[in-house]
Structure formats: structure tokens, C-alpha cells
């Protein structure tokens, strides 16, 4: 293989194949590095984490400006009378999140799990009430646009982009063309960054295995089985049922494509925001309506949190079973609703779904001290829990967007 063909494969070949190669090389590198540590004087696999950090940082950096520009361009050029399907997509997001929480409740009752409540060393500042989460979301909507871009506050970015887009619908065609050209330029930068995904995955896998390994997870096998099993059930059973209800045909080719492209990347980046550019690229490749996906995907990264709802529910019920608290069916359903609301605010809280566990624990009179210990357990299993949660959250964003768009096409055909 000559240099040009090798370069073409590394940066222009099938992305999933290249990511798979990066994954395998990362695992091999992490296994081999300890034997080289004495000769080199440092752990080489840990140093490779820099490659992963650069990749994730690049995606996170470009995501806010990508969303801002694409939404403005899409709405400014929106044809009068055209339909964006946003109402259907938001319904799908909310239904999917609630059903995810219900799935976690059933799984937890089928396989009751107890945990060793270790002392949590991290300094935590969990919100005290559900109203605080909802208030934070409202304040995010009216955030300063520069601050929203700087802090990657996607709710604020969407609010300003939608407002500017509506206003620019009355601008001249020249102005609209400039916005389109700007959006295209940012999209090309995103495409360039995504081409480095295999190198980023290689660095992330090598450093993660070198740092924590899998030994830290062995004490929580059953808890992880319930968590990951619930997420897999939602991904391969619940979501396909919802998609079939919308598109009225075999949903699995679409489900598999979304998991294969979006889910795999999100699993390693562990960031819904960082995966927005990947979802945008996939939506474009699926020929979805740009006016729809340019808004629904960043919105989904904020409110479509089925994986977070599962995490909150499973860990809360694990604490409940550990403490011997009786749980009635109505209370379990209420927990699903609370977990769904909490999950929708997870992106606006530092620490995500884990720091919202005290809200759900408060339903059962569990103190914040004990809830904080549950969060500590969450941090221990986070290497797998957070990755799987993000993969489910992010792949569902593009899946439900595609389902709504395809449903609309079916109605119009």
C-alpha cells in the first residue's frame, strides 16, 4: 500500500471501520505499555490520552458555532408554509425518556440490586428541588448569546439562533446566501475534525484502560448488568417499537445505522454535545430535512436523555433496596416521571445525571449524605455507565429525528 492510498484510507475511508481499528489498537497499546514502562520511565498509554483529549475538545469547540450558524441559515431560508416536524420530534423525545425510566424500574424490580455505600470524596453541589432544575433551564433560554456560545449552553444558543433566523427571513437574498456559505464552511471544518475520530478513539481507549482498567468495575457487576441491560433493551426493543409506530416498516436498518455511526462515536467521546457534529453529518447522509435536524439534534442533546433517566432510576432504586425501603407501584411510576424530568435537565448540571440522583432519592426520604454516597458509586462505574448512557442518548437524537422526517415523507407520498 503506497503513501497516498494509506492516507486516503486513514482520512477518507469507511469511518466505522477506521474507528474499529483505532479501538483495537488502543486496547493492544494499553496492554503492551506496562511492559515498556521500565524502559521508557513513563506509561506510554496514559500519554496517548492527549490525542483523545484534543479530539473531544475539538468537537466540543466546534459544536456551539455549528449549531448557531446552521439553525440561523436553516430558519432564514425556510420556505413559507413548510413543515419542520419539531412537535412530533419533541413528543418522541419525551415519550422515549419516560419509557426508558419505566424500563429501568421494571429491570430493577426483576433484579433487585444492593450496593456498598462507600464514602464519596468528591465535593458535590446537587440541586435541591426539581424546580431548581427547571428554573436553570429557563435561565439558560434567556442567556447572553456570547456567554451561551462560550459555555456551550445549547438551549441559549438555540433560542438566539431561532430568533435571528426568523428575523433574517426578511433579509435580502444576498444576506441569506452569506449565511448559507458560512454554514457550509463550518460544516466542512466539522467534517475535517470527524476524519480524525479513529486517532481520538485510539487515545481515549488507551488512556482509559491504562488509568482505570476493568478491575474497578468487578465489584459492581450486577449493578452494571441492570444499567447496561436496561439501556440495551431500550436501544434494541423500545426505540425500534417507537420508530416502527412512526414509519410503519422494519425499523432495525435505521436503528442499527444510528447506533453504528452515532452511538459508537458517542460511546468513546462520552459527550452528547461533542457528538452533535457526528449526528449532523449522519442526518445529512440520510437526506433528512436540514430545517428539521439542524434544530432537533442540538435540542435532543439537551432534553432527550433516556440513558440519564435509566441511570437516575437504577441507582436510586439500588439505594432504596440497600436501605430496605418498601416501594409501591404508584411510587415507582412517580419515580419514572421524576427521573424523566431530572434527565431533561441533566445537561444543565455539572456532573450530569449522577448529580441529579439526590432529587430522585428525596422521593423516598433518603438523605443527601446517603445520596452523595450513591453518586460516589456512580463515579466508580462511570467509565462504562457514562459511555453507554451517552451512546444511547446521542444515537436516539438522530434516530427519532429520522423517524419523524420519514413519517412525514410517507404521509406526503
Curated annotation (Swiss-Prot):
It catalyses: L-serine(in) + Na(+)(in) = L-serine(out) + Na(+)(out); L-threonine(in) + Na(+)(in) = L-threonine(out) + Na(+)(out). InterPro entries: Na-dicarboxylate_symporter, Na:dicarbo_symporter_sf, Ser_Thr_transp_SstT. The chain crosses the membrane at residues 21-41, 61-81, 89-109, 146-166, 189-209, 224-244, 305-325, 337-357, 363-383. GO terms for cellular component: plasma membrane. The keyword Transport applies. Gene3D superfamilies: Sodium:dicarboxylate symporter (1.10.3860.10). GO terms for biological process: serine transport; threonine transport. Keywords: Amino-acid transport, Cell inner membrane, Cell membrane, Membrane, Symport, Transmembrane, Transmembrane helix, Transport. It is a multi-pass membrane protein. HAMAP family: Ser_Thr_transp_SstT. Belongs to the dicarboxylate/amino acid:cation symporter (DAACS) (TC 2.A.23) family. Involved in the import of serine and threonine into the cell, with the concomitant import of sodium (symport system). This is Serine/threonine transporter SstT. It comes from Mannheimia succiniciproducens (strain KCTC 0769BP / MBEL55E).
